[in-house]
């Protein structure tokens, strides 16, 4: 560039216009039709003063070419491309985003446009990079917040689990204390431990189970042996013993046998077994009944229970001596009728007649006879368990 071209440049209308903009900061300047400035260049003139000052320092440099000193080069960094008043060069839009333009075809023009583009395009691309960075930062922050929430949630869950464990241990200790109070044990200075309480409870359960099973076995064996008893009630230990009492001077038999009553009488009347049980729940232990060898040839004898009215009607004709004995024990009597009495078998071969008279809450009298004679001595032995009620 020679001095002539530089002089023309400094004296041009465009240069004067730029100086005027720098001094007055006119943002609304509109050029005339002959100055060759477009509306886009006018918009570009509204840039801050600092950028304009930098542009002025660039224009004052002697390294610029005359062809690239048109007004379009002043606003190529912000405009989409403007026409040249001198017609020397034209700026073309290269399709860059955010309106970056490249002007001129000369080497200096390319360098200048590249410099301008480097100053303008990063400002337009920066929002995209900023948005991506902000999204990454938000993602990291959200991950950090999520981790913090998880830690808080884990802490709450740990506290809840500890509370449940404490409640479970309290309930377990209360249950063991209740078990200690129920189980009998020797008092000690310290209370039983949990393992001692469980061991003691196990031993009690085992022993009680053995006792219950033994009782059940005994009851089952008794039912099997006494399956013919009336209503499940039998007269036990009603047997003859060696060396027992003598009936009317007849020696006693050494053989013994257990007897039980039939379900029904020969006359068809039902037998009330409740009167055979004592008040304490035990079965009636009858006195021993003895027989002599002379009585072994006697056939089946019957046992008959009568109401008190029937016994009073038949006392005079059947058992006068036994009647006197029964009057001494509550004016009760019993008679024997061999025609309608069920048999009472002793030792499988011997049978005797047995009469029983029962008073309501007064006393019991028993007489044994061989169709005619009575054995008054047996009465005193048979009612022995009931003497406390007389």
UniProtKB/Swiss-Prot annotation:
Glycan-modified residues: 61, 128, 133, 140, 207, 237, 347
Tissues in which the protein is found: Detected in the developing nervous system in the bilateral domains in the cephalic region that later on forms part of the ring gland. Concomitantly expressed in the larval central nervous system (CNS), including the dorsal chain neurons as well as several bilateral clusters of neurons: large, midline protocerebral brain cells (MC), lateral protocerebral brain cells (LC), ventral subesophageal neurons (SE) and lateral abdominal neurons, and the transverse nerves.
Entry GO MF terms: DNA-binding transcription factor activity, RNA polymerase II-specific; E-box binding; protein dimerization activity
Region listing for Disordered, in residue ranges: 24-163, 312-339
Domain named bHLH: residues: 156-208
One Gene Ontology term from the biological process aspect of the record: ventral cord development
Location(s), subcellular: Cytoplasm
CDD domains referenced in this protein's UniProt entry, alphabetically: bHLH_TS_dimmed_like
The UniProt record lists the keyword Amino-acid biosynthesis: no
Main location: cytoplasm
Quaternary structure (record): Forms homodimers via the bHLH domain. These dimers bind the core E-box sequence.
Record's comment describing the protein's domains: The basic domain binds to the canonical E-box (5'-CANNTG-3'), with a particular preference for TA relative to AT or CG in the variable central nucleotide positions.
Name this protein carries in UniProt: Protein dimmed
Lineage: Eukaryota, Metazoa, Ecdysozoa, Arthropoda, Hexapoda
Encoding gene per record: dimm
């Amino acid at each position: 560039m020679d001095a002539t071209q530089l002089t023309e440049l400094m004296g041009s209308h465009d240069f004067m216009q730029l100086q005027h903009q720098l001094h007055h900061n006119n943002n609304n300047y509109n050029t005339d039709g002959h100055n060759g400035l477009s509306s886009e260049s006018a918009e570009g003139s509204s840039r801050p003063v600092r950028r304009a000052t930098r542009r002025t320092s660039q224009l004052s440099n002697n390294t610029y070419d005359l062809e690239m000193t048109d007004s379009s080069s002043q606003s190529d960094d912000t405009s989409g491309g403007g026409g040249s008043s001198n017609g020397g060069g034209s700026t073309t839009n290269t399709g860059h985003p955010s309106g970056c333009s490249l002007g001129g075809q000369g080497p200096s023009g390319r360098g200048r446009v590249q410099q301008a583009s480097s100053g303008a395009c990063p400002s337009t691309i920066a929002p995209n990079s900023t948005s991506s960075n902000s999204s990454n930062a938000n993602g990291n922050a959200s991950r950090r917040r999520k981790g913090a929430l998880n830690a808080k949630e884990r802490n709450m869950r740990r506290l809840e689990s500890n509370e449940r464990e404490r409640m479970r241990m309290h309930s377990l200790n209360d249950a063991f204390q209740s078990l200690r109070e129920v189980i009998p044990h020797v008092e000690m200075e310290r209370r039983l431990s949990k393992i001692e309480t469980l061991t003691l409870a196990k031993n009690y359960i085992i022993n009680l189970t053995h006792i219950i099973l033994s009782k059940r076995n005994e009851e089952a064996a008794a039912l099997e042996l006494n399956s013919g008893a009336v209503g499940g009630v039998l007269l036990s230990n009603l047997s003859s013993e060696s060396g027992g009492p003598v009936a009317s001077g007849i020696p006693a038999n050494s053989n013994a046998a257990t007897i039980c009553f039939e379900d029904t009488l020969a006359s068809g009347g039902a037998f009330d077994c409740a009167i055979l049980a004592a008040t304490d729940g035990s079965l009636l232990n009858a006195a021993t009944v003895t027989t002599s060898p002379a009585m072994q040839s006697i056939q089946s004898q019957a046992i008959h229970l009568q109401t008190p009215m029937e016994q009073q009607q038949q006392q005079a004709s059947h058992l006068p001596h036994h009647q006197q004995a029964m009057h001494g024990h509550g004016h009760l009597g019993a008679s024997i009728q061999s025609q309608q009495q069920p048999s009472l078998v002793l030792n499988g071969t011997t049978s005797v007649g047995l009469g029983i008279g029962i008073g309501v809450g007064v006393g019991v009298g028993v007489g044994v006879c061989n169709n005619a004679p009575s054995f008054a001595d047996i009465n005193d032995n048979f009612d022995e368990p009931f003497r406390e009620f007389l």
